[in-house]
Amino acid sequence: MESSVKYAQEFVQRYYSSLDTNRNGIAEFYRENSLILWNGKPMQVTEFTSMIVNLPYSKTKVEDFDSQQVMGNDMNIIIVVSGTIRFDGKKPHVFSYVSFYCIYLLVLRSSTNFL
């Protein structure tokens, strides 16, 4: 259980850091056949990364995350993340931050590595 929290914390830190500073690297967090839902719209990884790299610069603040180990043949982890994001070009004021809520399923890539 403790390792699932460690992996979740590492994922959240790396993913949102990449989202803010290295969007071209976001694809490394997904398998080639991953299906992504963005505001209810299903997309493949290539479509998703193309969309992400064209968004304005952002500053993300993760407010909270929770993780639970999912039992099965492999140890997988479900992560729920909430926070705020502000896109460049918006004047800083109380309404310039947009809340987000995301759910991820980390799937074991090797016997000891999720990321």
UniProtKB/Swiss-Prot annotation:
Record-annotated NTF2 domain positions: 7-115
Cellular-component GO terms for this entry: nuclear pore central transport channel; nuclear RNA export factor complex
SUPFAM superfamilies linked: NTF2-like
Keywords annotated in UniProt: mRNA transport, Nucleus, Protein transport, Transport
Taxonomy, superkingdom: Eukaryota
Keyword Transport: yes
GO biological process: poly(A)+ mRNA export from nucleus; protein transport; ribosomal subunit export from nucleus
Name by which UniProt lists this protein: NTF2-related export protein 1
Species name: Schizosaccharomyces pombe (strain 972 / ATCC 24843)
Lineage: Eukaryota, Fungi, Dikarya, Ascomycota, Taphrinomycotina
